Amino acid sequence: MPPHVDDVMKLCCELSANQQVKTAVKQSGKGAAAAGGLAFAGGLIGGPLGIAVGGAVGGLLGCWMKSGQFKPLPQVIMELTPDQQARLYEDIVAILGSITWTDVAQLTALVMGNASLQQQVTAALLSYIHKELQAEVHYID
């Protein structure tokens, strides 16, 4: 991986760590299928009351399936494939424009020292995560 790609990935990790962002890859379909499937099965077995019980149990199962799948955004960034990193790199470099840097420390200082640039890079990162990875983004309180 070219050094500049690695620098940009580390910058993205630093920005997301500072803002304490977590992501979850969407798996709502699995939760909905669990709720619907158990509601259907409950209806077959217990009639109208079975639908209610099956739906409630399925909803809890769906919630349990989804829980614990949030990861810190820096971890998600470091787990990107080389192709995904290259696409994210292109998005970020388009914002950085003609800025030149020698190492990740200098790049991080340049971006963190410019609130507007920091906001634009963060927005591009979150947009990439949402669009390309279909992930939910949450800020830790």
Curated annotation (Swiss-Prot):
One of its GO terms (biological process) is neuron development. It is found in: Mitochondrion; Mitochondrion membrane; Endoplasmic reticulum; Cytoplasm, Cytosol. It comes from the Eukaryota. GO terms for cellular component: cytosol; endoplasmic reticulum; mitochondrial membrane; mitochondrion. The keyword Acyltransferase does not apply. Keywords: Cytoplasm, Endoplasmic reticulum, Membrane, Mitochondrion, Transmembrane, Transmembrane helix. It is a single-pass membrane protein. The chain crosses the membrane at residues 37-57. The keyword Mitochondrion applies. Belongs to the C19orf12 family. This is Protein C19orf12 homolog. It comes from Danio rerio (Zebrafish).
